[in-house]
A protein has these predicted regions:
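Positively charged n-region of N-terminal signal peptides that target proteins for export
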Residues: 1-4
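Beta-strand-rich domains and repeat architectures in extracellular enzymes and scaffolds
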Residues: 25-56, 73
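Short coil/turn segments that connect the beta-strands within blades of beta-propeller domains
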Residues: 40-41, 79-81, 123-125
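A flexible loop/linker signature enriched in serine peptidases of the S9 family
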Residues: 46-52, 65-71, 84-96, 104-116, ...
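Bacterial N-terminal signal peptides
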Residues: 7-19
């Protein structure tokens, strides 16, 4: 009987090292979530190099991009209807926007230097991004804007 009790306790102690699943979500998987952006009704974040949104309480996660490229730097417009983000689809990082409900991303910049989203202008008509496109030494980022209707 004593031997059976010891084996049972050892078995239970081994299970204490197994990752716990809470509400169907493996808590270890959340380590891949990064770069959160918050609006009045949603959270946008990068998970496994794709852009996702969820409700403020974390429910209803929705994958917005499924491209082979790498998305980064999500940012909500002031009215919460658009998400601007940087993406590397053609070997270069450019600025894109997408409706918060999802859809096809719209490319706003076409430049050989990386364009990294930093936010929206106060009027919401342009996206603010950082780039080395005008820098002689490629050591310093400068800020630029591009209209949400497209640009350079």
């Amino acid at each position: 009987m004593k031997r059976l009790l010891i084996i049972g306790l050892l078995t239970l102690s081994l299970y204490s090292f197994v990752p716990v699943t809470i509400c169907g979500i493996n808590t270890n998987d959340t380590r891949m979530m990064s770069q959160p952006a918050i609006s009045a009704g949603h959270i946008a974040f990068i998970y496994a190099e794709d852009l996702w949104t969820a409700d403020l309480d974390g429910s209803n996660p929705k994958r917005l991009t499924v491209d082979e490229g790498i998305e980064s730097n999500p940012c909500f417009s002031h009215d919460g209807r658009l998400i601007a983000f940087s993406a590397q689809y053609d070997g270069n990082t450019d600025v894109y926007i997408i409706p918060v409900e999802g859809g096809v991303p719209v490319r706003l910049t076409w430049h050989p230097n990386s364009d990294l989203v930093r936010g929206f202008t106060p009027d919401g008509k342009s996206v603010l991004f950082a780039s080395q496109r005008s820098s002689f030494t490629n050591r310093y980022l400068q800020l630029f804007t591009v209209g949400i209707g497209g640009g350079f």
